[in-house]
């Protein structure tokens, strides 16, 4: 019996689409009502989560879709997972939900156990965790940690603040509010808050009308595919982009205190960074005393066939901070140097300091991934799925450009000639029973849960071939 069958013996055997259009009439009706109190314009359909199960999401019209988007890559184990339901019904969860603690001042007696459970899933080389509330919050907290660390190295870790620092910071001025930058990359997505938004550079709609920090955006490598046929050209691309990074660090108008990168830019188009590129960034950050942050918000927790995508690069020495959220349901960053803990309390602080209810779920997710060997399964299924997609690429090369993600689990994407054609394909896929997402201008990205198996891949490939023929 497969892992999916163990979890979901009553999972549907295939998608069922009952309506002629999506969203269907009942979804449209209820979305109109919901629209009175919530912005429903981005909605695909109105979901019925009580009826959704495993790898299938159901809407209020009774349509059941094979879900390869999984709540924008945030559902790790499928819908209504029994292990997570068990964790949700625990006394610890009830306490966390009913009497949510202000952890900084009033930590619960079980917090040590909860955090140590999360740390079982920490990336190699990381043994501390700082909790947050969302992916954007995780990155904002990481930036704060980086700035505090950077200034502590200049001033002395145990040194007190000067009177000038205490006075100037109240006017948002230096030296108390130092002029420092975070370097990110073009096409990056790190969140929609103010600092994270300043490092985001994927679509104008994410940033318009918001004041932003004047921080540098370097070039992220754009590889030619297949990778094994373009190794020389791609190495030149890596070196070109690395030279830009180093030049920006040396010449930017204010000091670059930190660098943040996604090992695969997800929202920006599923752009991959090579092992060589990620390691060379480590060399550069060490050379210029820059904090190295890996954003694993979307790539983390198993979808690439490893628990953390950057582990493919085996970066040495380990990066300074690794941010997480999405599939872990909780959020925060991992680190290993205790000096990233501020020298005084209340510097990295808020009322909640994370959410114990979500931390409990994160610990349960990590345990299930480990016990069921779900990263190994994801790697196996991803290889199977990629070979099937290569077959479609040979048959329809125009509609499967730059197929990428080989050897990266089910974290797979490809491009269509235009955004309009991509959007039409996604629409056809829904009508043929598959919920799939796009990214960037004309890319299709696959983000199924870790319980997605070969039988699901076969269903998807059949629906995809049919949808492409209908374009």
From Swiss-Prot:
How this protein's activity responds to pH is stated as: Optimum pH is 8.3.
Q: Name one Pfam family in it.
A: Aminotran_3
Q: Its family?
A: Belongs to the class-III pyridoxal-phosphate-dependent aminotransferase family.
Q: Where are the transmembrane segments?
A: none
Organism of this sequence? Saccharomyces cerevisiae (strain ATCC 204508 / S288c)
Copy out the induction comment: Subject to nitrogen catabolite repression. Expression is low in the presence of the preferred nitrogen sources, and up-regulated by GABA.
Q: What is known about what this protein does? A: Required for the degradation of gamma-aminobutyric acid (GABA), which is important for utilization of GABA as nitrogen source and for oxidative stress tolerance. Deaminates GABA to succinate semialdehyde, which in turn is converted to succinate by the succinate-semialdehyde dehydrogenase UGA2. Cannot transaminate beta-alanine (BAL).
Please state what the protein is called. Answer: 4-aminobutyrate aminotransferase
Complex and partners: Homodimer and homotetramer.
**UniProt-listed Enzyme Commission number(s):** 2.6.1.19
Give GO terms for biological process: gamma-aminobutyric acid catabolic process
Where does the chain bind pyridoxal 5'-phosphate?
A: 135-136, 351
UniProt keyword terms in alphabetical order:
Aminotransferase, Cytoplasm, Pyridoxal phosphate, Transferase
């Amino acid at each position: 019996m497969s892992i999916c069958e163990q979890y979901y013996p009553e999972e549907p055997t295939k998608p069922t689409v009952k309506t002629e259009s999506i969203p269907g009439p009942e979804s449209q009706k209820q979305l109109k009502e919901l629209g009175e109190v919530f912005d429903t314009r981005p909605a695909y359909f109105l979901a019925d989560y009580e009826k959704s199960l495993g790898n299938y999401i159901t809407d209020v019209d009774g349509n059941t879709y094979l879900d390869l988007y999984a709540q924008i890559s945030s559902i790790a184990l499928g819908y209504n997972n029994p292990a997570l339901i068990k964790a949700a019904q625990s006394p610890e969860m009830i306490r966390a939900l009913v009497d949510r603690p202000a952890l900084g001042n009033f930590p619960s007696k079980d917090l040590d156990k909860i955090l140590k459970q999360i740390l079982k899933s920490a990336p190699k080389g990381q043994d501390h965790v700082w909790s947050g509330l969302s992916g954007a919050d995780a990155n904002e907290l990481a930036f704060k940690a980086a700035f505090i660390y950077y200034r502590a190295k200049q001033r002395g870790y145990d040194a007190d603040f000067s009177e000038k620092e205490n006075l100037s910071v109240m006017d948002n001025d230096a030296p108390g509010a130092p002029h420092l930058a975070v370097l990110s990359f073009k096409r990056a997505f790190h969140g929609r808050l103010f600092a994270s938004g300043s490092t985001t550079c994927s679509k104008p709609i994410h940033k318009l009308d918001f004041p932003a920090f004047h921080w540098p955006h370097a070039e992220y490598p754009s590889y030619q595919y297949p990778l094994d046929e373009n190794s020389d050209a791609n190495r030149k691309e890596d070196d070109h982009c690395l030279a830009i990074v180093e030049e920006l660090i040396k010449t930017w108008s204010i000091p670059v205190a930190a660098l943040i990168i996604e090992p695969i830019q997800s929202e920006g188009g599923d752009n991959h960074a090579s092992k060589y590129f990620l390691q060379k960034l480590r060399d550069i950050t060490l050379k210029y005393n820059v904090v190295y942050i890996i954003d694993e918000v979307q790539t983390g927790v198993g979808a690439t066939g490893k628990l953390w995508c950057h582990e493919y690069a085996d970066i040495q020495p380990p990066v300074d901070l690794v941010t997480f959220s999405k599939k872990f349901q909780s959020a925060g960053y991992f680190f290993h140097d205790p000096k990233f803990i501020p020298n005084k309390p209340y510097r990295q602080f808020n009322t909640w300091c994370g959410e114990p209810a979500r931390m409990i779920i994160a610990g349960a997710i990590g345990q299930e991934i480990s016990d069921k060997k779900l990263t190994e399964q994801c790697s196996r299924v991803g290889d199977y799925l990629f070979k099937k997609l290569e077959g479609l690429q040979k048959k329809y090369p125009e509609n499967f450009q730059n197929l990428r993600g080989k050897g990266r689990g089910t974290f797979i994407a490809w491009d269509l000639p235009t955004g309009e054609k991509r959007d039409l394909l996604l629409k056809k896929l829904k009508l043929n029973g598959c919920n799939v997402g796009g990214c960037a201008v004309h890319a299709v990205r696959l983000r199924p849960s870790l319980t997605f198996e070969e039988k699901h891949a076969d269903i998807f490939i059949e629906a995809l071939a049919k949808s492409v023929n209908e374009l």
